[in-house]
């Protein structure tokens, strides 16, 4: 096994040298959003949010429900608390949302088709991989372990650590720092416009991922990203 790993590293070094001579840019780091990018979960979160509002007697439009997806979870809870439930403690809201989501993430929430294969291919090619997400750490970890991709991620970065939403590139910069890489050496994979724009502004290459909840933003995702994909098989076919 040790000999195989050594041989693989030598092959990777030779390949990188050849690419450098030819002027080919090699991706050293891949930074993935989780919900809506790796996990087919955005519709589930819309359902969870709608169920929460219904049980508390709150009427809310689809557009407003979707607006929360660009926020960190902490920002979403504060917004809901201030606008609709000032008498409900935020920790209580946190526990309720977490309880609703926990079973889905740990048992049956699916990954998007071919994304695990793509991540595995990058991992085998020696690319450093990070997750940058607004989600709960426990939910992300449980889903990734179930999907057998947890150990392929070198680092994890959460919006709660940087204290702001993805309209700021801080979470992507944190992920790159933990990978030991510069932004220009990393590609960010995202499904929301604010994330694509902020990552691009910080010097990252960007790939926008189509999702059932972002079709209204397709034109802007195409405009601001380096590439737009409708499915992960598109990237697998290029490897």
Where are these regions (language model features)?
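Residue-level detector of anion-binding/catalytic polar loops
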Residues: 59, 128, 205
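Conserved SAM-binding loop
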Residues: 38, 111, 129-132, 164, ...
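Intrinsic-disorder-associated, low-complexity terminal segments enriched in Asp/Asn/His/Tyr and depleted
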Residues: 2-5, 17-19
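Short beta->alpha linker loops
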Residues: 68-72, 110-114, 135, 167, ...
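Conserved phosphate-coupling serine/threonine residues in phosphotransfer and NTP-handling enzymes
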Residues: 37, 133-135, 210
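Asp-based, Mg2+/Mn2+-dependent phosphohydrolase catalytic module
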Residues: 17-28, 120-123, 137, 141-239
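N-terminal helical cap/lid subdomain that shapes the substrate entry/recognition surface
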Residues: 28-125, 150
């Amino acid at each position: 096994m040790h000999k195989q790993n050594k041989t693989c590293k030598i092959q990777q070094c030779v390949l990188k040298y050849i690419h450098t001579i030819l002027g080919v840019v090699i991706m050293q780091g891949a930074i993935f959003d989780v919900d809506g990018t790796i996990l087919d979960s955005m519709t589930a979160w819309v359902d969870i949010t709608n169920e929460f509002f219904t049980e508390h007697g709150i009427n809310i439009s689809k557009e407003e429900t979707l607006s929360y997806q660009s926020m960190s979870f902490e920002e979403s809870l504060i917004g809901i608390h201030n606008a609709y439930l000032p008498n409900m403690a935020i920790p209580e809201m946190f526990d309720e949302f977490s309880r609703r989501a926990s079973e889905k993430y740990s048992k049956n929430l699916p990954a998007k088709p071919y994304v695990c294969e793509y991540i595995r291919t990058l991992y085998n090619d020696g690319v450093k991989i990070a997750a940058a997400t607004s989600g709960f750490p426990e939910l992300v970890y449980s889903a990734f372990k179930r999907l057998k991709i947890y150990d392929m991620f070198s680092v994890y970065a959460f919006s709660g650590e940087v204290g702001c939403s993805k309209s700021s590139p801080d979470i992507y910069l944190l992920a790159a720092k933990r990978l030991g890489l510069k932004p220009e050496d990393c590609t960010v994979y995202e499904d929301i416009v604010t994330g694509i724009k902020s990552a691009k502004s910080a010097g990252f290459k960007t790939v926008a991922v189509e999702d059932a909840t972002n079709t209204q933003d397709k034109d802007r995702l195409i405009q601001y990203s380096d590439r737009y994909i409708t499915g992960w098989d598109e990237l697998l076919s290029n490897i």
